[in-house]
């Protein structure tokens, strides 16, 4: 995949109508935004375009309205909050069909530096099917397309891919540019030693990632629920731990592949277990890899955490995707905390691949110590799998 894409700085936007696909899929509680990280992330691109005298038309999805208007998924709260953040009114074009009379009039009346926000793109059923009719309507409002929504870059939708068939200038905003820089370098030309850490519940979610990364990394660390399938593959007992029986054979193949490639594959050597999946369950640390009958693994053990931390400390590039245990339960958060600490203390380029690991790092207060926290869980995973992301591929090459 070519990561060298035109950015907003490579195109002339003065006086032009610029359609910007943002990721404003923010959590709401009674119409109030409870986490505005995604709005903050979009500001540099919007402010740059304002400063250059562009006419800025913002669009985004929110939630899953499944192709029909749902009042609770309206982008009105986003327009209000953005107006405050930009110190400038963001005109909300409230059309159930997204590109309706309100949108057309708002765009027609725009002066250089003005900002309009369209209604939730997923109010239209065509959006997720990437159907021409809606792509054409969106494109008809603008002269230039800018994609700054990395979180949906792995989806071929009207507002991420379809519009580029009708707008010949298509560039990335600052958010996507940053993602391409850090994730692209990690995958293509990492500074070594390159360590990848994979956690989370399921091997099946990470099959292609494990396979692809074994061709690239010096050390691969496995933790979280998926670790128990690997332990079973090595012949250890795992009690009542989460296991994917149909992935045990695959895990054996990956252990062999790591040996062949000379990759240091690190798996748990001790575990924190309990007799039930409960925040109040009493944690017990196992002597070794084996987990007794009636117990389930809920975190990596202290010896494992030490080995993983040491591997991180000697790295020059670290990519982390997925927690080491059930970090929402205090008794089983230590593995995740130790990994986050080791990354925070490291001089390496440290990249967090969105989703649960990003949440964990932010909750633990290590966010500002990481080189880059990806804004897309699914998109960053597909990136690490080596897949081409349609929303990136559709942009102009430099």
Swiss-Prot record:
Its main location: cytoplasm. One of its GO terms (biological process) is gluconeogenesis. It is found in: Cytoplasm. GO terms for molecular function: ADP binding; ATP binding; phosphoglycerate kinase activity. Substrate binds at residues 23-25, 38, 61-64, 122, 155. ATP binds at residues 206, 297, 328, 354-357. Its EC number is 2.7.2.3. One of its GO terms (cellular component) is cytosol. Pathway: Carbohydrate degradation; glycolysis; pyruvate from D-glyceraldehyde 3-phosphate: step 2/5. It catalyses: (2R)-3-phosphoglycerate + ATP = (2R)-3-phospho-glyceroyl phosphate + ADP. It comes from the Bacteria. CDD domains: Phosphoglycerate_kinase. It holds the Pfam family PGK. It is an enzyme of class 2 (transferase). SUPFAM superfamilies: Phosphoglycerate kinase. PROSITE patterns: PGLYCERATE_KINASE. Keywords: ATP-binding, Cytoplasm, Glycolysis, Kinase, Nucleotide-binding, Transferase. Belongs to the phosphoglycerate kinase family. HAMAP family: Phosphoglyc_kinase. Monomer. This is Phosphoglycerate kinase. It comes from Clostridium botulinum (strain Langeland / NCTC 10281 / Type F).
């Amino acid at each position: 995949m070519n990561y060298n894409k035109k950015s907003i700085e490579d195109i002339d936007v003065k006086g032009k109508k610029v359609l910007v696909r943002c990721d404003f899929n923010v959590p709401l509680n009674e119409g109030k935004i409870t986490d505005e990280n995604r709005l903050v992330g979009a500001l540099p691109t919007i402010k740059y375009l304002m400063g250059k005298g562009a006419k800025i038309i913002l669009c985004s999805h929110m939630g899953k309205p499944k192709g029909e208007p749902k009042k609770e998924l309206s982008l009105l709260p986003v327009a209000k909050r953005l107006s405050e953040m930009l110190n400038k009114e963001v005109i909300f074009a409230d059309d159930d069909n997204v590109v309706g009379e309100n949108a057309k009039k708002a765009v027609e009346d725009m002066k250089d530096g003005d900002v309009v926000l369209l209604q939730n793109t997923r109010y239209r059923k065509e959006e997720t099917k990437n159907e021409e009719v809606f792509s054409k309507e969106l494109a008809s409002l603008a002269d230039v397309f800018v994609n700054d929504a990395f979180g949906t870059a792995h989806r071929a939708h009207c507002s991420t891919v379809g519009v580029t068939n009708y707008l010949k200038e298509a560039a990335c905003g600052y958010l996507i540019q940053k993602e391409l820089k850090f994730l692209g370098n990690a995958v293509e030309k990492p500074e070594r030693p390159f360590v990848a850490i994979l956690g989370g519940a399921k091997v099946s979610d990470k099959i292609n990632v494990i396979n692809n990364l074994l061709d690239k990394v010096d050390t691969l660390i496995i933790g979280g629920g998926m670790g128990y399938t690997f332990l079973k593959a090595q012949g250890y007992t795992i009690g009542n731990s989460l296991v994917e029986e149909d992935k045990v054979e695959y895990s054996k193949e990956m252990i062999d592949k790591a040996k062949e490639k000379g990759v240091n594959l690190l798996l748990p050597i001790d575990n924190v277990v309990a007799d039930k999946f409960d925040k109040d369950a009493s944690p017990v640390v196992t002597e070794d890899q084996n987990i007794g009958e009636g117990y389930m693994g809920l975190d990596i053990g202290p010896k494992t955490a030490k080995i993983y931390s040491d591997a991180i400390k000697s790295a020059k590039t670290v990519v982390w995707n997925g927690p080491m245990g059930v970090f929402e339960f205090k008794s089983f958060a230590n593995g995740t905390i130790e990994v986050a600490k080791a990354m925070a203390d490291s001089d390496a380029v440290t990249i967090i691949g969105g989703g649960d690991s990003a949440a964990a790092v932010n909750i633990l207060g290590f966010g500002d110590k990481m080189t880059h926290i990806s804004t897309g869980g699914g998109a960053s995973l597909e990136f690490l799998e080596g897949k081409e992301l349609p929303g990136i591929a559709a942009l102009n090459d430099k």
